[in-house]
Structure formats: structure tokens, C-alpha cells
Amino acid sequence: MLKPLFMDPYFNEKDWGGTRLKSVYGKPIPSDHTGESWEVSAHPMGLSACEGKTLPELIAEYGAQLTGTEVTGEFPLLIKLIDAREWLSVQVHPDDAYAQRVEGDPYGKTEAWVVLDCEPGAQLVFGIDCDNETLRSEIAQGRLDEHLVKVDVKVGDVLYIPAGTVHAIGANMLIYEVQQSSDRTYRLYAWGRNAELHIDKSLDVIDPKQGGKPMKGVKLAVEGGTREVMVLDPCFALERITATGRMPMKTDGTRFYAYTAVSDGKVIWDGGEHAYRAGQSFLIPAALGEYALEGGVLYKSYYPNVEKTVAELTALGVDMAHVGGKR
């Protein structure tokens, strides 16, 4: 088992979905309205798998060798590729406390996006410009859309979206998303489409102060390429890895690492190597030990020890103000 686990995703069909998961990444999508590829998922609504075993089955079989000694309880992350042919509904997600108290869910939903592809002039909804009391009144008057904050984005932009943030993906975008393992969404506005709305629960959880602009992140030169730290939050960390040569890595048994490649390369470990292509995702088990990435750009997500990671980055002179996350 101690090898990188290349995952077969679960596909989620959506009215707003399209075909770019196939045309860009060669994925065997089920229809021309495929909105999401759940790349790494132990969520019961859609399980990813490796060599015929679902991720929960692999976790049950290998335990901490796979997840790590510091990753306990429910598998914490859900990683997706999203093809938005049309605007998604304006929505918001609860935090852990609300999700557990009201919905009986183990997690709320903090997330982060990376814009993988978009058209010139692309925009996202990322926040609102009024308080919740005003928002309730404006919704009743049919004027919610006047208070949505839209931000311009381009390929490569990263947005950190904590629970409570009003947000929506714009049309004709391809997005990488890392989030807590939750499928709980409260819709505020559906652009005139026939979709169930959740106004009261949305207003319960909206934090009108959340929003802003894409994260700057910090770039570090490392052996074999660069490491860009974009988000460091108690829910997850997100880094962009550019392997211009052979980049040595190592696990210490405490946590797994999840990679999604956006260009081609290979992963090498003691006993083997495996090529990855753009759009593929793989897990590095916590007990793997030394491995290396050779070639390509990848997004790396993991469940961090925030205090330890902040100390390591600060020692390297990193300005943590440029890194998204609540710490």
C-alpha cells in the first residue's frame, strides 16, 4: 500500500456543468452537463477510489499509515475540479459549530478556489456590501443582486473562502477547489433559475465582513522548483508546487498529502515511479517517507499543524499576512 494512490473520481452532473473536464483533462465524464469531478473524496455523497477500493475502504484497511497520526475522526478534505458553463447560485456555507448543531454534520464548509481557466474579464461573487439586517430587507424587496460584490479574476488566482462568505463561481470557468468534507450549501440567489433557496439559514450564517480579493501567497525557492504557500487554515493548507526539476519531498507519519496536477510530470518513491498528467489527483500516504516530484505544476492540500507550520514559515522570513486563513 505504501505508494502514491492515484484516485478515480466521482462525477457530479449539474445543469450548469459542461464538457471541459473531458476536453481539457480527458476525463470520462458521464454527460455534457458534468459540473464536478470529486477527485479526493470520502464523503458519502460521492466516493473517489483507487484500484477498485473506495477511499473509506482504504482508510479502514490502512488507518494512520494512510491518513497520519494527527488526522483523526472523519476524513477532513474534499477536493474537486469544477466546470462552470453558467453562473452557479449565490451561496454560503455554515461553520463547524452551526453544521453540527443544526444539521448534524461533522464539518462545516470552509473552502479555497484556484482559477484554472477563464475568459478575459471573468468575475466571481465574493462577498456582500451590507449587513445581514439590511440584506434580509433587500431580499424581501427582490434586490439581493444589487448587493453582491463581484471581483475580477484571472488564471492562477487563489481565493480563500471561509464559512460564512457569500460567493458564486462565474460562467465559463474551470476551478480547483479544496474544502472541508461537507456538501452543505445554503442558496441565496439562483439568477432566475428554479432552485430551492435557504434564506433563513443563509442569514443565520452569513458573515458580511468576509470577502475581498485573491490571495497573494508567498513563493519559496526550494530544491527542484518553487513552493507557493497560498492558504494556511485550521481546516486545510493549500500550496502551489512547480517542479522545474526533481523536487524531493518527505512524509513524517503525521499526515497525508493530496496533489492535483495541472500539467504533466511524475512522482518517484522508493520502489517505483508513476507518471501524472494534467487533471489527475493522487494521495501520498502519511507513512510513505521519501518521495520526489519531477515536472509539472501541482496543487498540494493537507490537514496542517498550523502552529508548527507558521513557526517554520516565519523562520524562513515569510510574511504570513500574504497567506490566507484564520490562525
What does each model-identified segment do?
Residues 148-160, 174, 269-289:
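Short acidic-glycine-tyrosine-enriched beta hairpin
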Residues 186-253:
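C-terminal amphipathic alpha-helical segment
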Residues 1-130, 190-213, 238, 306-327:
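Transition-metal
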Residues 139-185:
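Loop-centered beta-sheet repeat module
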Residues 247-248, 263-269, 281:
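Short beta-strand segments in beta-sandwich/barrel cores
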Residues 129-141, 253-263:
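Short, basic/aromatic beta-hairpin or loop at an interaction surface
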Residues 74, 82-87, 118-121, 165-185, ...:
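Ligand-binding loop in jelly-roll beta-barrel domains
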